[in-house]
Amino acid sequence: MSNENSAVTKHAGVKKVVLAYSGGLDTSAIIPWLKETYDDCEIIAFCADVGQGDAELEGLYEKAIASGASECHIVDLKEELVADYIYPTIATGAIYEGTYLLGTSMARPIIAKAQVEVARKVGADAVCHGCTGKGNDQVRFEGCFAALAPDLKVIAPWREWEMVSREDLLDYLAERNIATSASATKIYSRDANAWHISHEGGELEDPWNEPSKGVWTMTVAPEDAPNQPEYVALELEQGKITKVNGEALSPYNALMLLNEVAGAHGVGRIDITENRLVGMKSRGCYETPGGTVMFAALRAIEELVLDKTSREWREQIGTKMAHLVYDGRWFTPLCESLLGASKPLADLINGEVVVKLYKGQASVVKKRSPNSLYSEAFATFGADDVYNQKDAEGFIRLYSLSSRIRALNNQK
């Protein structure tokens, strides 16, 4: 793509814009594009540290300035993300379409909120994101902006510029001598945070292609994992992991430790084709090692402490919450309502769990809770003196009464 072909008419009316900046392919191209597109516009780069790792943050400030930003604000959101967004979400049992633990989705509201806060701080009149016009994230970001700062103009370059592919972006950056770690042969779209990393694009766009070993970055291949299992002991209070192997840890540090331990055993990989909010299907490979262990631990205690109807209610809350988070509707009354409804149930999730990690599997092998409704004395198949089995007869007659009446009517 030549400079002449990529030229655009200068727009006025935006004096200062805060860009959600990652230093990746898309946002690296956006800074020069904004300067070329908007007349006399100051670009402020904003980067959310959500636990994506030091490698992604290293040199980010310098790169943003070299690309044309006047400032770069790097905001540490790691602990807040885990404590105030991830834990409340997984405590509802939210899991999208049965497999996806919502790693990208849960991070978007806190990033958008922090971006708005930076925009207010610097007096910006616009915010900008690098989300594709085909994806979910454009809806998530702009839904949050609408709820938090409806007065700010939103700039979405993927819906405006003439570039249509990541290959176009590579050419655009090469023409301007702006460095990027992406290449034509390694062109996955990745998004990482403390909870997970996602991989999309490139060879993965064909669901008949098995992901190569080079796709995965957070977990070892299960077949290459240790031949001996590892056991991890977790303590939970009100739906939160408070100790790992007896060590008290903050929510973020507990997750980091579990990521390391579970990732070494190949735990947390999924390869799915999901229904996007915008109507199309997309394929994603996700790695959520620590989160997979945490989710299993929560469900294990839940099995002990929730009665049947409470668990059915939690499942309804979890399904609705998963769609709400996936669809970018965190800052809504419905989200507050779902979180409020799930809290009395989450408060019961106290106890201890031992998880066995082996060759890609995280299996709960021990669990106990002070709130447990399970009683060995009642459930035993051996002799007991607490349960009169004759009591079941009257219960069964009442429980099956409607079926009995229907059958009698059919015999007439």
Swiss-Prot record:
Reply yes or no: does the keyword Ligase apply: yes
Question: Some GO term, biological process aspect, for this entry: which one?
Answer: L-arginine biosynthetic process
Q: Which reactions does this protein catalyse?
A: L-citrulline + L-aspartate + ATP = 2-(N(omega)-L-arginino)succinate + AMP + diphosphate + H(+)
Q: What class of enzyme is it?
A: ligase
Protein family according to the UniProt entry: Belongs to the argininosuccinate synthase family. Type 1 subfamily.
Subunit details for this protein? Homotetramer.
Q: What is the protein name for this chain?
A: Argininosuccinate synthase
Q: Which gene encodes it?
A: argG
